[in-house]
Design a protein with these regions (language model features):
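Conserved small/polar residues in nucleotide/adenosyl-binding loops
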Residues: 222-227
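Hydrophobic beta-strand residues in large extracellular and virion-surface proteins
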Residues: 63, 93-97, 132, 156, ...
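A short, solvent-exposed loop/turn motif at the edges and junctions
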Residues: 1-8, 97-107, 111, 123, ...
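Short, ordered, surface-exposed loop/turn motifs in non-cytosolic proteins
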Residues: 59-68, 162-179, 232
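Eukaryotic basic, amphipathic alpha-helical target segments in cytosolic regions
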Residues: 34-36, 55, 61, 65, ...
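Tryptophan-paired
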Residues: 1, 66-99, 174-217
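Compositionally biased low-complexity segments at domain edges in trafficked proteins
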Residues: 21-48, 126-155
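Asparagine-centered strand-capping/turn motif at beta-strand->loop junctions
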Residues: 54-57, 157-160
Length: 232
């Protein structure tokens, strides 16, 4: 790894150790504290998993880095550390239910503190929503997989007499659209209807909803406060 300093008491940080092959990195958490009792003149250096996944769902899941690699199985109510990542990894992971023909979710960030929602495919339910809660405690980032028992993140309601097509994109301008954005998942909202919705790409830094109605188009930038409420 890069040189580490043990001088700062209370230091909590991540440590990256390259593999011998050079294509993977081991991620650990480092915690430095004063010793207690007979160790009071010493500094206690603790190494812990940097990323710890806790599956609070009632069924086993597989988790894998979105850049590729072998999936890791996590049983119901089991905690499993994720140690190895690709070099220059964006720390995006994806999930699949065990025995679900490995239909993977959209990538999500295990580095961004907060909550995101993912759609998973289950045999008895085509749209199964789960919550991913990412929190940091000491040098470890805890990623909890939780059943989503409340309302969906968004409810889109079309109170007009026109059919509305909407989709998520990562940019508001045609010139900046990615290859994914040129063929996005599209949803049709019939007149006087409503639809539950969760982001198709929750790992995107910028989240836009592109609306199409009667040949007109408008992009709305979503923020945690509010989106622009003037669609056309």
């Amino acid at each position: 790894s890069k040189p580490l300093s043990f001088d700062v008491i209370g230091s909590e940080e991540g440590v990256v150790i390259p593999s011998s092959s050079g294509d993977r990195e081991l991620h650990l958490g480092l915690d430095i504290q004063d010793g207690l009792s007979k160790f009071k003149l010493s500094k206690v250096v603790k190494l812990a998993p940097r990323y710890l996944i806790h599956n609070k769902l009632s069924h086993a899941v597989l988790i894998a880095e979105s850049m590729g690699g072998d999936p890791v199985r996590i049983g119901a109510d089991e905690r499993v550390p994720l140690h190895w990542f690709h070099v220059a990894s964006n720390k995006h992971a994806t999930l699949a239910l065990e025995g679900s023909n490995l239909e993977w979710t959209a990538p999500f960030s295990i580095d961004n503190i907060g909550n995101v929602y993912l759609r998973m495919v289950r045999d008895d339910e085509p749209q199964h929503l789960i919550q991913v809660d990412v929190q940091i405690q000491g040098p470890t980032i805890f990623v909890r997989l939780l059943p989503s028992e409340g309302a969906w993140p968004f409810l889109l309601r079309n109170e007009t007499h026109h059919t509305i097509v909407f989709m998520q994109t990562g940019s508001s301008t045609e010139a900046q659209l990615s290859s994914r954005d040129t063929n996005p998942k599209r949803y049709v909202l019939k007149p006087r209807s409503k639809m539950k919705y969760a982001w198709d790409y929750p790992a995107d830094a910028d989240k836009y909803i592109r609306l199409q109605i009667n040949g007109s188009e408008r992009c709305l930038l979503y923020t945690s406060d509010a989106a622009d409420d003037t669609p056309f």
